[in-house]
Amino acid sequence: MRVIVYVSVGNSDDRLTQAEWHDFHVAMRAEVVTYAAVIHGEWFSDPVAKWQNASWCLEFDSNQDMIVAKKNATRIRTEFRQESVAWATAATEFI
C-alpha cells in the first residue's frame, strides 16, 4: 500500500540559529525523507524571507516505512526544540 504524506517544518518562532536550522533540515532529510520511495516535491521558503520553511511531498511504499519516518520526525522535532512538524497524510485521487 502506497501512502502520500506532506511534511512541513519551519522556524517561524526563530528558535533556531541559521546553523541549527541547517542541522534540523539535514536531520529531517536524512532520517525522514530518505524513508520515502519517491520524493514528489521539495520546497523551501525564499532565502531572504523573514522565516524559514521547508516542505516535502513523499510517497512511502508501506505503512511501516511511514511510521518509522513519522517517529523520526517527532524525535528530531524534540531534539531541535520545535513545537510541531506538520504531517498530512493525503487521500490521493486520480481524476
Feature roles, as predicted:
Residues A37, T78-I95:
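Conserved short beta-strand edge segments in small beta-sheet-based binding/regulatory domains
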Residues G10-R15, V33-T34, D46, R77:
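Alpha-helical interaction segments
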Residues S8, S12, T17, W56, ...:
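Extended, folded cores of ATP/NTP-driven motor/assembly subunits in large transport
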Residues V33-I67:
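Short, intrinsically disordered low-complexity segments
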Residues M1-V5, Y35, Q52-W56, R81-S84:
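Generic structural motif recognizing short loop/turn segments at the entrances and edges of beta-strands
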Residues H22-M28, I67-F80:
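Short amphipathic alpha-helices in soluble, non-transmembrane regions
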Residues M1-F24, A30:
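Short S/T/G/P-rich N-terminal loop/turn motif that feeds into the first structured element of a domain
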